[in-house]
Amino acid sequence: MNSSTSTMSEEPDALSVVNQLRDLAADPLNRRAIVQDQGCLPGLILSMDHPNPPVVHSALLALRYLAECRANREKMKGELGMMLSLQNVIQKTTTPGETKLLASEIYDILQSSNMADGDSFNEMNSRRRKAQFFLGTTNKRAKTVVLHIDGLDDTSRRNLCEEALLKIKGVISFTFQMAVQRCVVRIRSDLKAEALASAIASTKVMKAQQVVKSESGEEMLVPFQDTPVEVEQNTELPDYLPEDESPTKEQDKAVSRVGSHPEGGASWLSTAANFLSRSFYW
Protein backbone atom coordinates (compact mmCIF):
# COMPACT_ATOMS: atom_id res chain seq x y z
CA MET A 1 0.00 0.00 0.00
CA ASN A 2 1.28 3.45 -0.81
CA SER A 3 -0.18 5.42 2.09
CA SER A 4 2.42 7.19 4.19
CA THR A 5 2.86 6.61 7.89
CA SER A 6 1.76 10.14 8.69
CA THR A 7 -1.43 9.69 6.66
CA MET A 8 -2.29 6.45 8.39
CA SER A 9 -1.73 8.00 11.82
CA GLU A 10 -4.18 10.78 11.04
CA GLU A 11 -6.85 8.64 9.38
CA PRO A 12 -8.62 5.40 10.27
CA ASP A 13 -7.23 2.22 8.77
CA ALA A 14 -8.96 0.45 5.89
CA LEU A 15 -10.66 -2.11 8.12
CA SER A 16 -12.16 0.58 10.37
CA VAL A 17 -13.50 2.51 7.37
CA VAL A 18 -15.03 -0.59 5.79
CA ASN A 19 -16.54 -1.60 9.13
CA GLN A 20 -18.11 1.84 9.48
CA LEU A 21 -19.58 1.62 5.99
CA ARG A 22 -20.89 -1.83 6.86
CA ASP A 23 -22.55 -0.44 9.99
CA LEU A 24 -24.15 2.40 8.02
CA ALA A 25 -25.35 -0.03 5.36
CA ALA A 26 -27.02 -2.15 8.04
CA ASP A 27 -29.60 0.64 8.42
CA PRO A 28 -32.12 0.49 5.53
CA LEU A 29 -32.53 4.27 5.67
CA ASN A 30 -28.91 4.76 4.61
CA ARG A 31 -28.64 2.33 1.70
CA ARG A 32 -29.75 4.56 -1.17
CA ALA A 33 -27.47 7.40 -0.07
CA ILE A 34 -24.42 5.14 0.19
CA VAL A 35 -24.89 3.73 -3.31
CA GLN A 36 -25.57 7.19 -4.77
CA ASP A 37 -22.34 8.53 -3.26
CA GLN A 38 -19.65 8.75 -5.94
CA GLY A 39 -16.90 7.17 -3.87
CA CYS A 40 -18.29 4.59 -1.48
CA LEU A 41 -19.33 1.89 -3.95
CA PRO A 42 -15.99 2.01 -5.84
CA GLY A 43 -14.24 1.88 -2.47
CA LEU A 44 -16.10 -1.26 -1.45
CA ILE A 45 -15.30 -2.85 -4.81
CA LEU A 46 -11.62 -2.14 -4.26
CA SER A 47 -11.97 -3.66 -0.79
CA MET A 48 -12.85 -7.02 -2.31
CA ASP A 49 -9.29 -7.24 -3.65
CA HIS A 50 -7.69 -6.28 -0.34
CA PRO A 51 -5.02 -8.70 0.98
CA ASN A 52 -6.54 -8.68 4.48
CA PRO A 53 -9.42 -11.26 4.61
CA PRO A 54 -11.40 -9.40 7.32
CA VAL A 55 -11.53 -6.31 5.07
CA VAL A 56 -12.91 -8.41 2.21
CA HIS A 57 -15.53 -10.07 4.42
CA SER A 58 -16.66 -6.78 5.96
CA ALA A 59 -16.94 -5.16 2.52
CA LEU A 60 -19.08 -8.06 1.31
CA LEU A 61 -21.37 -7.71 4.32
CA ALA A 62 -21.80 -4.03 3.43
CA LEU A 63 -22.56 -4.91 -0.20
CA ARG A 64 -25.05 -7.57 0.92
CA TYR A 65 -26.90 -4.97 2.97
CA LEU A 66 -26.90 -2.51 0.06
CA ALA A 67 -28.19 -5.15 -2.35
CA GLU A 68 -31.26 -5.69 -0.18
CA CYS A 69 -32.57 -2.39 -1.54
CA ARG A 70 -34.02 -3.25 -4.96
CA ALA A 71 -33.50 0.29 -6.20
CA ASN A 72 -29.74 -0.11 -5.68
CA ARG A 73 -29.22 -3.31 -7.65
CA GLU A 74 -28.96 -1.98 -11.20
CA LYS A 75 -26.43 0.66 -10.22
CA MET A 76 -24.44 -1.83 -8.17
CA LYS A 77 -24.38 -4.36 -10.99
CA GLY A 78 -23.25 -1.73 -13.50
CA GLU A 79 -20.53 -0.30 -11.27
CA LEU A 80 -17.11 -0.85 -12.84
CA GLY A 81 -15.44 -3.97 -11.44
CA MET A 82 -18.35 -5.13 -9.26
CA MET A 83 -19.24 -8.43 -10.91
CA LEU A 84 -15.65 -9.28 -11.82
CA SER A 85 -14.47 -8.68 -8.26
CA LEU A 86 -17.24 -10.88 -6.88
CA GLN A 87 -16.20 -13.63 -9.30
CA ASN A 88 -12.59 -13.28 -8.21
CA VAL A 89 -13.52 -13.68 -4.55
CA ILE A 90 -15.57 -16.79 -5.34
CA GLN A 91 -12.84 -18.40 -7.45
CA LYS A 92 -9.80 -17.52 -5.34
CA THR A 93 -8.56 -20.68 -3.64
CA THR A 94 -7.48 -18.85 -0.48
CA THR A 95 -10.89 -17.28 0.17
CA PRO A 96 -12.60 -18.68 3.33
CA GLY A 97 -15.73 -20.73 2.68
CA GLU A 98 -18.16 -18.31 4.34
CA THR A 99 -16.74 -15.44 2.31
CA LYS A 100 -17.17 -17.41 -0.93
CA LEU A 101 -20.82 -18.11 -0.12
CA LEU A 102 -21.48 -14.47 0.74
CA ALA A 103 -19.91 -13.27 -2.51
CA SER A 104 -21.91 -15.86 -4.45
CA GLU A 105 -25.13 -14.70 -2.81
CA ILE A 106 -24.47 -11.06 -3.75
CA TYR A 107 -23.57 -12.08 -7.30
CA ASP A 108 -26.85 -13.99 -7.61
CA ILE A 109 -28.90 -11.03 -6.40
CA LEU A 110 -27.25 -8.54 -8.75
CA GLN A 111 -27.12 -10.88 -11.73
CA SER A 112 -30.86 -11.55 -11.50
CA SER A 113 -31.82 -7.88 -11.11
CA ASN A 114 -32.80 -7.33 -14.76
CA MET A 115 -33.02 -10.83 -16.22
CA ALA A 116 -36.09 -12.73 -17.36
CA ASP A 117 -37.29 -15.25 -14.81
CA GLY A 118 -36.03 -18.27 -16.76
CA ASP A 119 -32.63 -16.78 -17.51
CA SER A 120 -32.32 -15.59 -13.93
CA PHE A 121 -33.10 -19.03 -12.53
CA ASN A 122 -30.59 -20.75 -14.81
CA GLU A 123 -27.86 -18.21 -14.14
CA MET A 124 -28.33 -18.41 -10.37
CA ASN A 125 -28.23 -22.20 -10.43
CA SER A 126 -25.06 -22.12 -12.51
CA ARG A 127 -23.48 -19.63 -10.13
CA ARG A 128 -24.39 -21.71 -7.10
CA ARG A 129 -22.97 -24.86 -8.67
CA LYS A 130 -19.74 -23.06 -9.44
CA ALA A 131 -19.56 -21.67 -5.91
CA GLN A 132 -20.13 -25.13 -4.45
CA PHE A 133 -17.35 -26.51 -6.63
CA PHE A 134 -14.90 -23.99 -5.23
CA LEU A 135 -16.19 -24.45 -1.68
CA GLY A 136 -15.77 -28.21 -1.69
CA THR A 137 -18.03 -30.90 -0.31
CA THR A 138 -17.86 -29.77 3.32
CA ASN A 139 -19.68 -26.49 2.60
CA LYS A 140 -23.01 -27.55 1.17
CA ARG A 141 -25.93 -25.27 0.44
CA ALA A 142 -26.51 -22.44 2.89
CA LYS A 143 -29.68 -22.25 4.95
CA THR A 144 -31.62 -19.41 6.51
CA VAL A 145 -32.53 -19.20 10.19
CA VAL A 146 -34.97 -16.59 11.51
CA LEU A 147 -34.46 -15.61 15.14
CA HIS A 148 -36.68 -13.63 17.47
CA ILE A 149 -34.33 -11.96 19.94
CA ASP A 150 -35.68 -10.79 23.28
CA GLY A 151 -33.77 -7.67 24.29
CA LEU A 152 -32.93 -6.54 20.74
CA ASP A 153 -34.37 -3.10 21.26
CA ASP A 154 -31.70 -0.52 20.46
CA THR A 155 -28.55 0.06 18.43
CA SER A 156 -26.14 -0.89 21.19
CA ARG A 157 -27.89 -4.25 21.58
CA ARG A 158 -27.77 -4.76 17.82
CA ASN A 159 -24.04 -4.11 17.88
CA LEU A 160 -23.61 -6.69 20.64
CA CYS A 161 -25.59 -9.19 18.60
CA GLU A 162 -23.53 -8.45 15.48
CA GLU A 163 -20.32 -8.95 17.43
CA ALA A 164 -21.50 -12.32 18.71
CA LEU A 165 -22.66 -13.54 15.28
CA LEU A 166 -19.54 -12.39 13.45
CA LYS A 167 -17.42 -14.59 15.69
CA ILE A 168 -19.24 -17.79 14.71
CA LYS A 169 -17.53 -19.87 12.05
CA GLY A 170 -20.18 -20.71 9.47
CA VAL A 171 -22.22 -17.50 9.58
CA ILE A 172 -22.46 -16.01 6.08
CA SER A 173 -24.64 -12.93 6.50
CA PHE A 174 -27.40 -11.53 8.67
CA THR A 175 -30.08 -8.85 8.52
CA PHE A 176 -31.83 -7.20 11.45
CA GLN A 177 -35.53 -6.32 11.58
CA MET A 178 -35.39 -4.09 14.64
CA ALA A 179 -39.10 -3.22 14.68
CA VAL A 180 -40.03 -6.84 15.36
CA GLN A 181 -36.84 -7.85 17.23
CA ARG A 182 -35.77 -10.32 14.58
CA CYS A 183 -32.58 -11.34 12.86
CA VAL A 184 -32.48 -13.32 9.60
CA VAL A 185 -29.21 -15.27 9.48
CA ARG A 186 -27.69 -17.11 6.52
CA ILE A 187 -25.49 -19.97 7.72
CA ARG A 188 -23.69 -23.00 6.35
CA SER A 189 -25.89 -26.08 6.29
CA ASP A 190 -23.62 -27.89 8.75
CA LEU A 191 -23.98 -25.18 11.41
CA LYS A 192 -26.72 -25.73 13.98
CA ALA A 193 -29.12 -22.93 14.86
CA GLU A 194 -28.39 -23.67 18.53
CA ALA A 195 -24.92 -22.23 18.01
CA LEU A 196 -26.50 -18.88 17.11
CA ALA A 197 -28.65 -18.98 20.23
CA SER A 198 -25.64 -19.77 22.43
CA ALA A 199 -23.67 -16.89 20.96
CA ILE A 200 -26.54 -14.46 21.52
CA ALA A 201 -27.08 -15.76 25.06
CA SER A 202 -23.40 -15.08 25.76
CA THR A 203 -24.18 -11.35 25.59
CA LYS A 204 -26.04 -11.83 28.93
CA VAL A 205 -28.69 -9.29 27.87
CA MET A 206 -30.42 -11.05 24.96
CA LYS A 207 -32.06 -14.41 24.36
CA ALA A 208 -33.02 -15.96 21.02
CA GLN A 209 -35.93 -18.12 19.93
CA GLN A 210 -36.32 -19.63 16.46
CA VAL A 211 -39.19 -18.47 14.25
CA VAL A 212 -40.75 -21.39 12.36
CA LYS A 213 -43.93 -21.87 10.36
CA SER A 214 -46.53 -24.46 11.29
CA GLU A 215 -48.27 -26.68 8.75
CA SER A 216 -51.07 -24.12 8.59
CA GLY A 217 -48.57 -21.38 7.74
CA GLU A 218 -48.70 -19.61 11.10
CA GLU A 219 -45.47 -18.42 12.66
CA MET A 220 -44.40 -19.99 15.95
CA LEU A 221 -41.60 -19.20 18.38
CA VAL A 222 -39.57 -22.25 19.37
CA PRO A 223 -37.25 -21.82 22.38
CA PHE A 224 -33.77 -23.29 22.35
CA GLN A 225 -32.47 -25.54 25.09
CA ASP A 226 -30.68 -23.73 27.88
CA THR A 227 -27.70 -26.08 27.57
CA PRO A 228 -24.85 -24.09 25.98
CA VAL A 229 -23.60 -25.32 22.62
CA GLU A 230 -19.90 -25.20 21.83
CA VAL A 231 -19.38 -22.59 19.12
CA GLU A 232 -16.46 -22.72 16.71
CA GLN A 233 -14.89 -19.28 16.71
CA ASN A 234 -14.12 -17.47 13.46
CA THR A 235 -10.57 -16.37 14.21
CA GLU A 236 -10.08 -14.67 10.83
CA LEU A 237 -12.50 -11.87 11.63
CA PRO A 238 -11.39 -8.80 13.60
CA ASP A 239 -12.68 -7.48 16.88
CA TYR A 240 -15.82 -5.43 16.29
CA LEU A 241 -15.61 -1.66 16.44
CA PRO A 242 -16.11 -0.30 19.95
CA GLU A 243 -19.41 1.50 20.42
CA ASP A 244 -17.89 4.97 20.57
CA GLU A 245 -16.42 4.49 17.08
CA SER A 246 -19.64 3.32 15.46
CA PRO A 247 -21.32 5.91 13.21
CA THR A 248 -24.70 4.20 13.78
CA LYS A 249 -24.74 4.86 17.51
CA GLU A 250 -27.91 6.88 17.05
CA GLN A 251 -30.14 6.32 14.04
CA ASP A 252 -30.92 9.96 13.36
CA LYS A 253 -27.23 10.85 13.41
CA ALA A 254 -26.41 7.98 11.09
CA VAL A 255 -29.00 9.17 8.58
CA SER A 256 -27.89 12.80 8.70
CA ARG A 257 -24.28 11.71 8.42
CA VAL A 258 -25.03 9.95 5.14
CA GLY A 259 -26.90 12.53 3.20
CA SER A 260 -29.29 14.92 4.92
CA HIS A 261 -26.80 17.79 5.22
CA PRO A 262 -24.50 18.14 2.19
CA GLU A 263 -21.93 20.27 3.99
CA GLY A 264 -21.70 17.97 7.02
CA GLY A 265 -23.32 14.60 6.59
CA ALA A 266 -22.08 13.65 3.15
CA SER A 267 -18.58 14.81 4.01
CA TRP A 268 -17.96 11.72 6.13
CA LEU A 269 -18.81 9.47 3.19
CA SER A 270 -16.58 11.53 0.92
CA THR A 271 -13.71 11.31 3.38
CA ALA A 272 -14.19 7.56 3.71
CA ALA A 273 -14.43 7.09 -0.05
CA ASN A 274 -11.29 9.14 -0.69
CA PHE A 275 -9.41 7.17 1.93
CA LEU A 276 -10.51 3.85 0.43
CA SER A 277 -9.53 4.94 -3.06
CA ARG A 278 -6.07 6.07 -1.95
CA SER A 279 -5.40 3.09 0.28
CA PHE A 280 -6.50 0.14 -1.83
CA TYR A 281 -3.97 0.48 -4.64
CA TRP A 282 -0.81 -1.56 -4.09
Curated annotation (Swiss-Prot):
Q: Which Gene3D superfamilies match?
A: Leucine-rich Repeat Variant
Instruction: Please report the name of this protein according to its UniProt entry.
Output: Armadillo repeat-containing protein 1
Q: What does this protein do?
A: In association with mitochondrial contact site and cristae organizing system (MICOS) complex components and mitochondrial outer membrane sorting assembly machinery (SAM) complex components may regulate mitochondrial dynamics playing a role in determining mitochondrial length, distribution and motility.
- Residue list for modification Phosphothreonine: 137
| Compartments it resides in | Cytoplasm; Mitochondrion; Mitochondrion outer membrane
Q: How does it assemble?
A: Interacts with mitochondrial contact site and cristae organizing system (MICOS) complex components IMMT/MIC60 and MICOS10/MIC10. Interacts with mitochondrial outer membrane sorting assembly machinery (SAM) complex components SAMM50 and MTX1.
Q: Which branch of life, at top level?
A: Eukaryota
Q: Where is the composition biased (Basic and acidic residues)?
A: 246-255
